[in-house]
């Protein structure tokens, strides 16, 4: 059993242990993804971000 959540009609998160909401929609995991120090795919992820212009250095500067 894992902690799950769904969004109610007001947009608020409702936490539950069930796999589907009362509206018969799938619930989402409330746990963050695992972080591994041994990141095998970081080189590929950076290459894809560079190719599609998604790196922060490729974005226009933020104005405050």
Swiss-Prot record:
One BP annotation, GO: rRNA processing
SUPFAM superfamilies the record matches: Nop10-like SnoRNP
Pfam families (UniProt xref): Nop10p
Listed GO MF terms: RNA binding; snoRNA binding; telomerase RNA binding
Subcellular localization: Nucleus, Nucleolus
UniProt keyword terms in alphabetical order: Nucleus, Ribonucleoprotein, Ribosome biogenesis, rRNA processing
Any GO CC annotation of this UniProt entry: box H/ACA snoRNP complex
Record function comment: Required for ribosome biogenesis. Part of the H/ACA small nucleolar ribonucleoprotein (H/ACA snoRNP) complex, which catalyzes pseudouridylation of rRNA.
Record PANTHER family: H_ACA RIBONUCLEOPROTEIN COMPLEX SUBUNIT 3 (PTHR13305:SF0), RIBOSOME BIOGENESIS PROTEIN NOP10 (PTHR13305)
Subunit structure: Part of the H/ACA small nucleolar ribonucleoprotein (H/ACA snoRNP) complex.
Family: Belongs to the NOP10 family.
Annotated protein name in UniProt: H/ACA ribonucleoprotein complex subunit 3
Organism of derivation: Dictyostelium discoideum
């Amino acid at each position: 059993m894992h902690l799950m959540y769904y969004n109610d009609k007001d947009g608020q998160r409702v936490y539950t242990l069930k796999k589907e909401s009362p509206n018969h929609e799938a619930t989402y995991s409330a746990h963050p993804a695992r972080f591994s120090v041994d990141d095998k795919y970081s080189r590929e992820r950076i290459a894809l971000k560079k190719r599609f212009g998604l790196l922060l250095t490729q974005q226009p500067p933020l104005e405050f």
